[in-house]
Amino acid sequence: MQEYNQPLRIGVGGPVGSGKTALLEVLCKAMRDTYQIAVVTNDIYTQEDAKILTRAEALDADRIIGVETGGCPHTAIREDASMNLAAVEELAIRHKNLDIVFVESGGDNLSATFSPELADLTIYVIDVAEGEKIPRKGGPGITHSDLLVINKIDLAPYVGASLEVMEADTARMRPVKPYVFTNLKKKVGLETIIEFIIDKGMLGR
């Protein structure tokens, strides 16, 4: 029987291109000196997101596992999370004192959710470039995630999106749940996400 700490598991979901991998890169770089971190990525046929994080030197390569889900990526984070659970366990055995494991889902739609067996907290990432109507479309990612990240606010003028409309719709869809507007390239909103993780994950500094 292997002895290891049970890390905080944070599911990161959102549509393709919304900024999930970019979020993980900046979170890892900002938090790795204070916390022991690892990442599991999900791609259908490749390990591309794992390679991106490795090339960006977000973490050492032995702290990142890429899961090739095949078929439907939603199943691997909900109905049959066994591959992801095994990857989390493998990382926890490799690094006995892990504080956090981020589990990035494959690109999914607004209906994808994480199994409670796999994620203790969930962060859902959407982006302004998808249009200002995205928050009001709802779906579990929008309404039920523990934190909603609305990314790429810098693109709003270029796509004709009103951040005021998006904020009003988001507040209506998530009346008691937190959300944050971000520009991850410039780290706008990053500190709010980190504080959320520390607070809700009950992590000491």
Curated annotation (Swiss-Prot):
Homodimer. UreD, UreF and UreG form a complex that acts as a GTP-hydrolysis-dependent molecular chaperone, activating the urease apoprotein by helping to assemble the nickel containing metallocenter of UreC. The UreE protein probably delivers the nickel. The keyword Cytoplasm applies. Induction: The probable operon is induced by urea. It is found in: Cytoplasm. GO terms for molecular function: GTP binding; GTPase activity; nickel cation binding. One of its GO terms (cellular component) is cytoplasm. Belongs to the SIMIBI class G3E GTPase family. UreG subfamily. Facilitates the functional incorporation of the urease nickel metallocenter. This process requires GTP hydrolysis, probably effectuated by UreG. One of its GO terms (biological process) is urea catabolic process. Keywords: Chaperone, Cytoplasm, GTP-binding, Nickel insertion, Nucleotide-binding, Plasmid. This is Urease accessory protein UreG. It comes from Escherichia coli. GTP binds at residues 14-21. It comes from the Bacteria. InterPro entries: CobW/HypB/UreG_nucleotide-bd, P-loop_NTPase, UreG.
